[in-house]
Structures are given as structure tokens and as C-alpha cells.
Amino acid sequence: MRLSDLAKGATAVIHEVEDANLNDPISRRLRELGFVRGEPVRVVAQGPIGGDPLLVQIGFTRFALRRAEAARVHVIPEELA
């Protein structure tokens, strides 16, 4: 499942960040920000138009991600982790 598929209020554990290509700067930056395997993540809010952007939280830090960026983050829903 992808982070972009989670409903508002849902919690999951990050499985991996998908690279679109070799040396993908967006995926690299997501990992630098803490989107790494085993880290819990929660969808706090979704934008009004098409759900873009997503407001997600890792630890005490919140990030606004475009759906395309969130789709690179593969997660395991909390109830399955």
C-alpha cells in the first residue's frame, strides 16, 4: 500500500521509499527527512481538491506532501504491522 492511499487519521509503518530513477532527488530527500523503514507515519489531513496535498506526521514533525510524492512511500497499515 502507498502512503497516498491511506485515509485521514490512518497510521502505518513505512516499508520503503521507491526511487523513480537512479539518484532520484525526491526519494533521497524523503529519506533524509525521516521517511525510512520501520518509522510510524500518520495522515493528519488531506487537501480539499483531490486530496492534494497530504499532511503527514512522523514523530513530532509534520510534512505537506503532494500525492505524487506520497505515492513513492510504501507503507504497511498499522493493523497489519
Give residue ranges: language-model regions:
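Short alpha-helix capping/helix-loop boundary micro-motifs
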Residues: 23-29
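Short beta-strand-initiation
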Residues: 1, 28, 41-42, 51
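Conserved hydrophobic positions within beta-strands
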Residues: 14, 40-43
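Residue-level recognition of beta-strand microenvironments
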Residues: 17, 33, 44-46
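Acidic, low-complexity mobile loops and tails
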Residues: 13-20
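C-terminal structural segments of small proteins and small subunits
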Residues: 3, 10-12, 48-81
